Design a protein with these regions (language model features):
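Gram-negative outer-membrane beta-barrel transporters
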Residues: 382, 433-438, 443, 450-452, ...
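Transmembrane beta-barrel wall of Gram-negative outer-membrane proteins
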Residues: 211-241, 251-292, 310-325, 433, ...
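Outer-membrane beta-barrel signature, preferentially recognizing the C-terminal barrel domain
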Residues: 303-327, 365, 415, 419-421, ...
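Extracytoplasmic beta-strand/coil segments of soluble accessory domains associated
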Residues: 82, 86-137
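Short acidic/polar hinge/loop motifs at secondary-structure boundaries
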Residues: 115-116, 132-170
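C-terminal beta-signal and adjacent terminal beta-strands/loops
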Residues: 135-138, 511, 575, 688-706, ...
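Flexible loop and strand-edge segments within Gram-negative outer membrane beta-barrel domains
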Residues: 255-257, 275-331, 342-366, 402, ...
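A beta-strand signature from Gram-negative outer-membrane beta-barrel systems
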Residues: 152-206, 788
């Protein structure tokens, strides 16, 4: 929003603040000269004058970036971590079904684990709230290397009602993004007072209530804002109560669940003068989920009890920011921010430990993040310079215990060491503009330097319950820590084919630093019951950073009046993907220099694989009323994504095999109608997804004894393709009251999400039960009301 502020007085600053989102949508590809816009508010209870705002050209950027607004989320039925991405090409939320054993252990929580963007998922995609990264999903070291790319506690710490928009950055993150990730970023932006206030409207109150039949959930949300040009604030509260998300299988219904959540946000903006805008924000989120589900024996053929689980998720954040716009000879703007974030995840599970006994497993994950970020901008002739610095200190704890004290054979050690990690970074970028026969051409070089240092803490906690493992032994294995510096260049070429249509070619270097689960994830390290056959899974403090080279060509803008489109073709190459290698003390003595003497076989995290992914995306909207007055209000939306990817390990005899995290081809087509003045409207949207079967490999069971890797005989179930139709509508029944709703999966189609079901088999009764649990909801509906003053 700051790009709209350049060269404006305080009065104009405030006038445009609330309307910046609307201006952005309407003018993203406006002509190169300034455009005069007539804007009026539709939220006031009294007639208001039309404001005329002169907005400068908005910056055009290379790369695949998209935004989902709060209005988009409500229109499309996006009311949780996953459904907000319902129609977004190339982006899907991944997760595990309640009570399922697919990708989770009996004490692991169900739900969303993260996002998949163009075939990379979970911790390789940054997820943040106002630029503060949410915690990584926790690894499942306690199931040895079979747990690769599965997670015990996911990254869902949000309530969509709290956000004014969600920004999505596909591919490796840009140099200006402080949180580096090779898979992209999903950025949740909190609501602000400027979203609701302007000089003619100094108060706002909104109430929203919704019901969703897919999980019988009720939502009630309140947004209140007030203030003037100098001082203004906002308060947002959201309450949700629901049950289990229904599956669509006649033989096996979803396991019972009962959950509720509360979210609060308070933010104050103070503009003491024309040069400073100071914003203080506090936000809080808490969700509790109670559920119970079957517990199966190790063969997967007999249910020997019922597990009961309570999961609690909390997030608390504080931030203070200053936007300084002196417009002097040195800088145009300087934005600085400090922040703190605290998160907690607690899973308490009372579950069978055998056919005749029960235990309680306490699995926790706590983090604290402290950070700062500062960015400056300056225009010098044809040069648009930006630069910034950032730093973050993160502390993680992973308490884990069983009660009563388990036997030697069933004890589970703390899954990873507590850790301390600090990250420092800085970037410089220059957009150099040229006039080529009245067409703007820009060269955009940039570079980010990122440094991360991670060390374990409280190593004595890993020795709990062990008679052979000592703190000094763990310190020898992990105590050295891990650090790395990455130089990440980028280069883009942008050319305006017309004043409203741009093409670009872009290269970006990406980096993904190792996380605590990979560095210090451990299992069986303190065991000695198997003698010289004793094995363990261990992390690796010497891991290298995963890296990527990303190439993209795209076309974005308005090719003709009434048509907006974005298209991209890309190729990404990756190396140093982290996985697990098997070593024996007798066959690989050099790998056991720091390994405790009670362990004779290890599964150790290493930089094992390389991969590539290529694909294409297309999205856009057509307004037919631009050409035919009789169908004013009729529009169509479309989106398409296609990806292919393969990976290869360093094992002898291995070859490139389909990368299972790459999603199948997907298309979205919609037709909508909006009456004059948006008094009512309706839309029908169809989603088509191609079927796909994941390819199994023997990489996770390779003995690493010198023989060539053989092909796997495991046969994953094919996830069938599907077509699904959704119907949505709204009606402005009064000036301040709007009804909205939708019917989703109108034809009650039975289908599965490939990314959450790709490794399922039908070998055992439990496997077949998991397949039934993984079916997505059948026909459901949502109904909501908005009251705004």
């Amino acid at each position: 929003m700051s790009s709209l502020f350049q060269g404006m007085t305080q009065q104009r600053l405030f006038k445009v603040a609330i309307l910046s989102s609307a201006i952005h949508a309407a003018c993203s590809y406006a002509a190169s000269d300034n455009t005069t816009l007539a804007l009026s508010s539709d939220k006031s209870t009294t007639a208001e004058s039309v404001m005329t705002v002169t907005a400068p050209k908005l910056e055009k950027q290379a790369g695949s970036k998209s935004t989902i607004t709060a209005a988009d989320m409500q229109r499309d039925g996006g009311n949780d971590f996953g459904t907000i991405m319902r129609y977004e090409p190339g982006v899907t939320a991944t997760g595990a079904s309640g009570g399922s054993s697919a990708g989770k252990s009996g004490f692991d929580r169900a739900g969303y684990t993260g996002y998949n963007i163009r075939g990379l998922e979970s911790n390789r995609v940054d997820i943040n709230v106002d630029g503060v990264s949410l915690p990584d999903a926790t690894g499942r070291s306690y199931v040895s290397r079979a747990g690769l790319d599965t997670f015990g506690i996911g990254r869902d710490y949000i309530d969509p009602y709290m956000f004014g928009r969600v920004d999505i950055d596909k591919g490796a993150t840009s140099v200006s993004q402080p949180n580096t990730a090779i898979g992209g970023a999903v950025s949740f932006r909190n609501k602000t007072p400027d979203d609701y206030l302007h000089p003619d409207k100094t108060t706002y109150f909104g109430y929203q209530s919704d019901f969703d039949s897919s999980n019988r959930s009720w939502h009630n949300g309140i947004t209140a804002a007030a203030g003037d040009e100098e001082l203004r604030g906002i308060f947002v509260y959201s309450r949700r109560d629901g049950q289990e998300t229904q599956n669509n299988d006649a033989s096996r219904g979803a396991y019972p669940a009962n959950w509720h959540s509360d979210a609060l946000l308070g933010s104050v903006v103070w503009e003491p003068n024309d040069a400073h805008k100071i914003t203080g924000t506090a936000d809080f989120y808490h969700k509790t989920n109670h559920t119970h589900y079957d517990s199966w024996d190790t063969s997967g053929n007999t249910v020997y009890g019922t597990a009961q689980q309570q999961s609690d998720t909390r997030r608390f954040g504080l931030s203070l920011a200053d936007e300084y716009t002196p417009y002097n000879d040195f800088i145009d703007s300087l934005t600085s921010r400090v922040y703190w974030q605290h998160t907690e995840a607690h899973d308490n599970t009372y579950m069978p430990s055998s056919a005749t006994a029960y235990e309680t497993v306490y699995s926790d994950y706590n983090t604290d993040s402290y950070g700062f970020e500062t960015n400056l901008a300056k225009t010098l002739g044809r040069h648009e310079l930006t630069a910034g610095l950032n730093g973050c200190l993160e502390k993680t704890e992973r308490p884990f215990r069983q009660s009563p004290t388990p036997s030697t054979f069933s004890v589970i050690m703390q899954p990873e060491a507590d850790s301390r990690s600090y990250t420092l970074g800085g970037f410089v970028q220059d957009k150099i503009n040229f006039d080529l026969d009245s067409h703007n051409f820009a060269v955009v070089p940039g570079v980010r330097v990122a440094y991360q240092n991670t060390k374990p803490e409280n190593l004595s906690s890993l020795t709990s319950g062990s008679s052979v493992l000592t703190e000094s032994g763990v310190d020898t294995l992990y105590g050295s820590g891990n650090s790395d510096t990455q130089v990440l260049p980028s280069l883009a070429f942008q050319y305006e084919l017309t004043p409203t249509l741009m093409t670009y070619l872009q290269y970006k270097r990406g980096a993904q630093f190792p996380n605590a689960s990979q560095l210090y994830g451990s299992w069986n390290l303190g065991s000695s019951y198997a003698g010289r056959a004793q094995y363990a899974l261990i992390g690796n403090a010497d891991l290298d950073t995963e890296t990527s080279n990303n190439f993209e060509w795209g076309l974005k803008g308005q090719p003709t009046e009434g048509v907006v489109m974005n298209t991209a073709v890309y190729y990404n190459a990756y190396k140093n993907f982290i996985a697990y290698n098997r070593y024996t003390r007798s066959g690989n003595p050099n790998k056991f220099t720091n390994v405790p003497s009670n362990i004779y076989t290890t599964y150790q995290a290493e930089n094992r694989d390389k991969a590539y992914i290529y694909g294409a995306e297309l999205s856009g909207k057509v307004n037919f009323g631009t050409w035919y007055e009789d169908v004013q209000g009729l529009s169509a939306r479309f989106a398409f994504s296609y990806n292919e990817g393969k990976s290869k390990s360093s094992y002898l005899g291995d070859r490139y095999v389909d990368l299972e995290s790459v999603p199948p081809m997907k298309a979205v087509l919609g037709l909508g109608w909006d009456a004059p003045q948006n008094q009512y409207g309706a839309a029908v949207t169809a989603t088509f997804v191609k079927g796909k079967k994941a390819t199994a490999t023997n990489r996770q069971s390779y003995t690493n004894t010198g023989s060539a890797l053989t092909d796997s005989t495991t046969d994953y179930a094919r996830v069938p393709g599907y077509g699904m139709v959704d119907l949505t509508a709204y009606w402005q029944v009064a000036k301040n009251v709007k009804l909205s709703g939708g019917v989703y999966n109108l034809t009650d189609r039975k289908y599965w999400d490939y990314l959450s079901s790709r490794e399922m088999t039908s070998d055992t009764a439990q496997d077949r039960n998991d397949i039934a649990l993984a079916t997505q909801p059948g026909r459901t509906f949502q109904l909501g009301v908005n009251v705004d003053f």
